[in-house]
């Protein structure tokens, strides 16, 4: 069995693949101070509830955008799973061209998404990943990563309003029925949600104009479901895109071993 650990700035996903399908997934708040031992206690309890155990794994793959956490995640795999993990950005061969000025700066999540999208959809593509930050990445027809755009995430935008403006409350994000709000909460929700839709549509249009080629737009990430039905600019919503990419990277590296 394979344990895939996909760590973003806000949440960390632990997913179990039995060789045929994903059989379990759990999320935890990302905490860079959590030790390998703490991860093991938490994970072993969840595995036990699913009829599994830490010792059942013969592989582990890690994708993290939090460098200070990788040490502890690696030790979790070594100490408790008794396997050497495959770490995106360190010892994992991706098998795709990275056509940007500084390839070492490309985030692990963006590269994993590129692979997950390329094997599922005909390219070229724009992959939108909505999390703490929202990324718009261009994937060539041959699967090459060609760069993209990084913007603040929708939750970060709403939190910035509350933090920087003394009289604005902390507000939950939801899709308003109208653009013009008639109270403070409604106005904030409309501004952030519909403003974000405008950002998505505007950046997609500009990327397509700059590339001058047809591009399929695929959205993933923790808050991508918020945008479903709110814009025609997104062609596909794919919540499993990232772990699909991780599984493909694992298989490619196993084939070379």
UniProtKB/Swiss-Prot annotation:
Substrate binds at residues 107-110, 184. It is found in: Cytoplasm. ATP binds at residues 6-13, 132. Its cofactor is NH4(+); K(+). It catalyses: (R)-pantothenate + ATP = (R)-4'-phosphopantothenate + ADP + H(+). InterPro entries: ATPase_NBD (IPR043129), Type_III_PanK (IPR004619). The keyword Cytoplasm applies. Keywords: ATP-binding, Coenzyme A biosynthesis, Cytoplasm, Kinase, Metal-binding, Nucleotide-binding, Potassium, Transferase. One of its GO terms (cellular component) is cytoplasm. One of its GO terms (biological process) is coenzyme A biosynthetic process. Pathway: Cofactor biosynthesis; coenzyme A biosynthesis; CoA from (R)-pantothenate: step 1/5. Pfam families: Pan_kinase. K(+) binds at residue 129. Its EC number is 2.7.1.33. GO terms for molecular function: ATP binding; metal ion binding; pantothenate kinase activity. The active site is at residue 109. A monovalent cation. Ammonium or potassium. HAMAP family: Pantothen_kinase_3 (MF_01274). Belongs to the type III pantothenate kinase family. Catalyzes the phosphorylation of pantothenate (Pan), the first step in CoA biosynthesis. Homodimer. PANTHER family: TYPE III PANTOTHENATE KINASE. This is Type III pantothenate kinase. The gene is coaX.
């Amino acid at each position: 069995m394979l344990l895939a650990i996909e760590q973003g700035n806000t949440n960390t996903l632990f997913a179990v693949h039995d060789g045929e399908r994903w059989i379990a997934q759990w999320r935890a708040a990302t905490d860079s101070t959590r030790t390998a031992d703490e991860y093991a206690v938490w994970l072993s309890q969840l595995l036990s509830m699913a009829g599994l155990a830490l010792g059942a794994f013969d592989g582990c793959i890690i994708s993290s955008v939090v460098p200070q956490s990788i040490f502890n995640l690696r030790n979790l795999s070594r100490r408790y799973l008794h396997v050497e993990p495959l770490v995106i950005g360190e010892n994992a061969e991706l098998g795709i061209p990275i056509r940007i000025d500084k390839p070492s700066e490309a985030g692990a999540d963006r590269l994993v998404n590129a692979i997950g999208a390329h094997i599922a959809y005909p390219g070229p593509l724009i992959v939108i990943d909505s999390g703490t930050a929202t990324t718009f990445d261009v994937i060539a027809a041959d699967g090459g990563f060609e760069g993209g755009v990084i913007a603040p995430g929708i939750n970060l935008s709403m939190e910035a309003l509350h933090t920087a403006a003394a009289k604005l409350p902390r507000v939950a994000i939801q899709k308003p029925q109208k653009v013009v709000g008639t109270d403070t909460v409604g106005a904030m929700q409309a501004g952030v949600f519909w403003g974000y839709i405008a950002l998505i549509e505007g950046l997609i249009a500009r990327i397509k104009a700059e590339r001058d080629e047809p591009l399929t737009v695929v959205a993933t990430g923790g808050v991508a479901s918020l945008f479903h039905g709110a814009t025609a600019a997104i062609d596909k919503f794919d919540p499993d895109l990232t772990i699909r990419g991780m599984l493909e990277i694992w298989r490619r590296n196993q084939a070379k071993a």
